[in-house]
UniProtKB/Swiss-Prot annotation:
The gene is dnaJ. Zn(2+) 2 binds at C162, C165, C188, C191. The J domain is necessary and sufficient to stimulate DnaK ATPase activity. Zinc center 1 plays an important role in the autonomous, DnaK-independent chaperone activity of DnaJ. Zinc center 2 is essential for interaction with DnaK and for DnaJ activity. One of its GO terms (biological process) is response to heat. This is Chaperone protein DnaJ. Belongs to the DnaJ family. Zn(2+) 1 binds at C145, C148, C202, C205.
Length: 375
């Protein structure tokens, strides 16, 4: 099955800006996140959205994708020039290695190698993402078997050198090619490329040299993290191989939506409902912020859609570059379930105001003020 176009996946145009791509990703990642969406196939859609964002948010990867799409230009003979494509089950590195005695360097199966990286998804409340916190997580990961010290062999015994590959972890296979008979190196299937055979396996780890355990890790979540961002914990991944360094743990943050606030970068947005009288006559109201309640003066004549800004009341930048603002959008609430007296007042106001704008000799809200004040 062919891959979908990354722009189509995110629902943006090919000329979309980085901000547009980021907004689309955040919206779709929340929609399809496995912790929220339990529908079948949501996890695959989440992975598809993540893959598209990782490519289109990177300038170099995006330029490469715009030019070549999902096709790797380094494969085959066409377009991008001569590459290391498939040629009858062997590579050109193997051919030239056989003919000229050079080619790629053989990897030592017993050389130290870094352990695999791990990923952990952490769900945060809106407030915890804004202010940060200290927490402890528990992850399953492989630890070096203490019984055999990672060798995989029963205590008192040692792994033996593979007799098939001589400890190299590779076998030389002869093949007939248009260039003649050449030697192609393959991973030794007898020792699975390790160069060692374990005849007496450790009873605790079954010869693997590793045991699955759950480990508790303290995590310091920085203030200002956003949905989709990740924190790298060096050395907290899988243990290294043959004495190599451990891999890293990547903690990916998923931030739950807030019932009142919305976030865009370091800025916070919210909608403030006002009564008809408050909007017409003006008022001083208390506005909730992440940092506590703040008094906001509403001028007379304020209409739906009017915006106010509270500087420094947003989220701290995760890299320490200042503080965001809180933006307030006014929504004037039309009264419902009016009493007879309230209906009479509004009818009286309508008679004073007139029904057409050109009949009004003063501003609409001046008349509202007069009607409510009884002038």
């Amino acid at each position: 099955m062919s891959k979908r176009d990354y722009y189509e996946v995110l629902g943006v145009s090919k000329s979309a800006s980085k901000d547009e791509i980021k907004k689309a990703y955040r919206k779709l990642s929340k929609k399809y996140h496995p912790d929220i969406n339990k529908e079948a196939g949501s996890d695959e859609k989440f992975k598809e959205v993540k893959e598209a964002y990782e490519t289109l948010s990177d300038d170099q990867k995006r330029a490469h994708y715009d030019q070549f799409g999902h096709t790797d230009p380094n494969q085959g003979f066409g377009g991008g020039g001569f590459g290391g494509g498939d040629f009858g089950g062997f590579g050109f590195d193997d051919i030239f290695s056989s003919i000229f005695g050079g080619g790629t360097r053989r990897r030592d199966p017993n050389a130290p190698r870094q352990g695999a990286d791990l990923q952990y998804t952490m769900t945060l409340s809106f407030e915890d993402a804004a202010f940060g916190k200290e927490t402890t997580i528990e992850i399953p990961r492989e630890e070096t078997c203490e019984t055999c010290k990672g060798s995989g062999a029963k205590p008192g015994t040692n792994p033996e050198t593979c007799s098939h590959c001589g400890g190299s972890g590779q076998l030389n296979v002869e093949q007939n090619t248009p260039f003649g008979k050449v030697v192609n190196r393959r991973v030794c299937h007898h020792c699975e490329g390790t160069g060692k055979i374990i005849k007496n396996k450790c009873a605790d780890c079954g010869g693997k040299g590793k045991i699955k355990k759950r480990k508790k890790i303290n995590v310091t979540i920085p203030a200002g993290v956003d949905d989709g961002q990740q924190l790298r914990l060096s050395g907290q991944g899988e243990p290294g191989i043959n004495g190599g360094p451990a891999g890293d743990l990547f903690v990916v943050f998923h931030v739950r939506a807030h019932e009142f606030f919305e976030r865009d970068g370091d800025d916070i947005y919210c909608e403030m409902p006002l009564t008809f009288a408050q909007a017409a006559l003006g008022d001083e109201v208390e506005v909730p912020t992440l940092h506590g309640k703040v008094k906001l003066k509403i001028p007379a004549g304020t209409q739906t859609g009017t915006k106010f800004r509270l500087r420094g009341k947003g989220v701290q930048n995760v890299r320490g570059y200042g503080q965001g603002d809180q933006h307030i959008v006014v929504r004037v609430v039309t009264p419902t379930n009016l009493t007879d007296k309230q209906k009479d007042i509004i009818r009286e106001f309508a008679e004073v105001s007139g029904n057409l704008p050109d009949e009004q000799e003063m501003s609409f809200f001046d008349k509202v003020k007069r009607a409510f004040k009884g002038d």
